[in-house]
């Protein structure tokens, strides 16, 4: 571990990691009636709280409630949030839970019927409800085949666990848009790491074979029953009762209560009529449109690529202008793989979106100048911290990419960075380095909320 100057807070950070980046070759369970889904996504969870010296101050004994031998309690723990009462909410597999920091159970619930395979996102919204990223447990495709879908449903749940609404993305977006799916590196698709596929991409023929062979499950592909969307964050906008999703394999999308797309923050490539009109226009600080062709733009503006955590900065946004923080992982940047793997980089980005004019301005970024050492091919977080007016960035899988200096080495030594940057600056005031751990997310924990204010 290492730290740079600490001048903004005496912080504790919750860290949600894995010890190993390699997924098991054989899972204990898979769905078979119907097939598909991501039940086998049951990685080890390593959840703790560290201080700014990197010392462990709290650890979650997840085995008490998380049993890999039980399909109803297995799953990787993801989507941690600290609620206003100081407790923690998160989910794993077929469950979503709430506990305080002393381990007291507030609730531990099965997902509602018709939904399965929670992962990634648990948003406690301003309307008192929670939005969970799940999947459909029994969807009949247009070709008549029944499947579990994969990471493409958002369910809204009230305080008592009742279903209020859901957003079925295969009915809202185009599940056959394949541009990003074909361009991305198949060696690292979120937590599915397979170094034997490093640098490989999918072709249109590969995608067609999946349909011909009836191949479904947690595989990159197109169509319901495959990992065509990979939604990894959900955020509620109270000004218009809408949600903002980060779809790793499509882009960032705002969807209204009427299930209509409000806008899309992504490369215009591949969007058909009905969606193409919703793609935001990039502009400079004077509001002048920026020329973009073939998924590349003039100047410093860039879309986000295979991104995570598209979150509204509530205190700086209003009903017309929205500030959005994004962790731009950077795989498939420009809808292609670069000539050399060490040309890849990740970014933390803030976009300013004028929702009336349908424009987007990039107002802050960090990461391009850091280059490949900070490249995080999967996972990651960018989050605004209102109490300190800083940007929290977790370069969660730095070091995972290929190490060109070591011949034949496709997986490097992991060294995630927990960083905080003062608003508008690009030099971190906090920089904590972790070694030999596979990161998912990290964020500051407020002890006053947990033990004093409530």
Locations of regions flagged by a protein language model:
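Surface-exposed loop and turn segments in beta-propeller and other repeat-based domains
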Residues: 61-71, 110-114, 164-224, 262-301, ...
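Short, small-residue-biased leader/transition segments that mark boundaries at the very start
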Residues: 3-8
């Amino acid at each position: 571990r290492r730290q740079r100057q600490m001048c903004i807070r005496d912080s504790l950070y919750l860290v949600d990691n894995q010890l190993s980046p390699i997924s098991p070759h054989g899972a204990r369970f898979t769905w078979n009636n119907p097939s598909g889904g991501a039940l086998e996504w049951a990685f080890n969870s390593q959840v703790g709280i560290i201080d700014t010296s990197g010392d462990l101050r709290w650890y979650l004994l997840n085995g008490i409630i998380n049993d890999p031998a039980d399909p109803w309690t297995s799953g990787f723990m993801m989507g941690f949030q600290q609620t206003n009462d100081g407790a923690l909410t998160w989910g794993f597999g077929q469950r979503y839970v709430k506990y305080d920091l002393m381990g007291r159970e507030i609730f531990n619930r099965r997902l509602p019927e018709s939904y399965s395979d929670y992962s990634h996102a648990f948003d406690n919204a301003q309307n008192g409800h929670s939005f969970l990223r799940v999947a459909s447990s029994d969807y009949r495709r247009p070709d008549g085949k029944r499947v579990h879908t994969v990471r493409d449903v958002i369910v809204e749940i009230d305080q008592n666990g009742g279903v209020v609404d859901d957003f079925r993305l295969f009915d809202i977006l185009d599940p056959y848009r394949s541009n990003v799916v074909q361009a991305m590196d198949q060696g690292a698709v979120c937590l599915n790491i397979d170094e034997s596929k490093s640098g490989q991409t999918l072709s249109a023929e590969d995608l067609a074979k999946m349909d011909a062979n009836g191949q479904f499950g947690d595989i990159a592909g197109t169509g319901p029953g495959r990992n065509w969307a990979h939604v990894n964050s959900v955020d509620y906008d109270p000004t218009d009762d809408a949600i903002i999703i980060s779809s790793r394999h499509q882009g960032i999308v705002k969807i209204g209560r009427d299930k209509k797309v409000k806008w899309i923050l992504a490369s215009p490539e591949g969007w058909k009529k009905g969606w193409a009109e919703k793609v935001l226009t990039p502009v400079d600080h004077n509001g002048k449109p920026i020329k973009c062709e073939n998924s590349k733009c003039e100047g410093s503006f860039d879309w986000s690529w295979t991104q995570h955590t598209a979150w509204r900065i509530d205190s700086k946004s209003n009903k017309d202008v929205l500030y959005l923080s994004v962790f731009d992982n950077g795989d498939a940047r420009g809808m292609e793989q670069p000539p050399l793997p060490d040309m890849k980089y990740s970014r933390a980005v803030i976009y300013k979106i004028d929702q009336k004019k349908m424009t987007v301005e990039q107002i802050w970024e960090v990461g391009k100048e850091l280059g490949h050492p900070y490249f995080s091919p999967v996972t990651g977080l960018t989050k605004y911290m209102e109490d300190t007016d800083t940007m929290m960035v977790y370069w969660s899988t730095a070091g995972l990419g290929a190490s060109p200096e070591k011949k034949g080495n496709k997986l490097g030594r992991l060294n995630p960075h927990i960083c905080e940057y003062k608003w508008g600056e690009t030099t971190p005031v906090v920089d904590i380095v972790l070694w030999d751990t596979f990161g998912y997310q990290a964020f500051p924990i407020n002890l006053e909320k947990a033990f004093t204010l409530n």
